[in-house]
Amino acid sequence: MQSIVLILILQLVYVPFLTLRTIFLVKNITFLAAIFGMLEMLVYVFGLSLVFSGKQSMLAMVVYAVGFGLGIFLGAKIERKLAIGYVYTTINTQNKNEELVRFLRNEGFAVTIYVGEGRDSNRYKYEILTKRNRETELFQIVEQFEPNAFIISYEPKSFKGGFLLARMKAKQK
């Protein structure tokens, strides 16, 4: 029974390591990806050896698979909590909301505003690049000022220059 519990625990460690390694690799954080890759393989080999050692029990194999599924869930929760990287958010409104813009800027968000031609009238587009860990906060602020706003958010692969980069360099000094 101890080995069954150990297999489950190892899967709950292995799969989040796999998730983090993949995220760091995609985000081009190679050193951490390599560290997590090494740890991932150590846990993987040890866990698999427990499943296939001695008498191969069906229960051990099922627990291994269940642990993998639970590990995916746990890894996703960890990833959301860490919120590594940046999001580029576009907000579209029917009216120019100076109060929203002022509030966002006071909260440290860099906002660029464009006027676009909609079907029936002009539309206002606000572009914001921010850290992923502030995405929920940004959405809540926009919802408070513009409940009918259309919002799109996605992760940029790379960027260069701009307000955010200058501010990050200033904080490092």
Swiss-Prot record:
<keyword id="KW-1003">Cell membrane</keyword>
<protein>
    <recommendedName>
        <fullName>UPF0316 protein Bsph_0745</fullName>
    </recommendedName>
</protein>
<dbReference type="InterPro" id="IPR019264">
    <property type="entry name" value="DUF2179"/>
</dbReference>
<dbReference type="Pfam" id="PF10035">
    <property type="entry name" value="DUF2179"/>
</dbReference>
<feature type="transmembrane region" description="Helical">
    <location>
        <begin position="58"/>
        <end position="78"/>
    </location>
</feature>
<feature type="transmembrane region" description="Helical">
    <location>
        <begin position="4"/>
        <end position="24"/>
    </location>
</feature>
<dbReference type="GO" id="GO:0005886">
    <property type="term" value="C:plasma membrane"/>
</dbReference>
<dbReference type="InterPro" id="IPR022930">
    <property type="entry name" value="UPF0316"/>
</dbReference>
<feature type="transmembrane region" description="Helical">
    <location>
        <begin position="31"/>
        <end position="51"/>
    </location>
</feature>
<comment type="similarity">
    <text>Belongs to the UPF0316 family.</text>
</comment>
<keyword id="KW-0472">Membrane</keyword>
<keyword id="KW-1133">Transmembrane helix</keyword>
<dbReference type="Pfam" id="PF18955">
    <property type="entry name" value="DUF5698"/>
</dbReference>
<keyword id="KW-0812">Transmembrane</keyword>
<dbReference type="InterPro" id="IPR044035">
    <property type="entry name" value="DUF5698"/>
</dbReference>
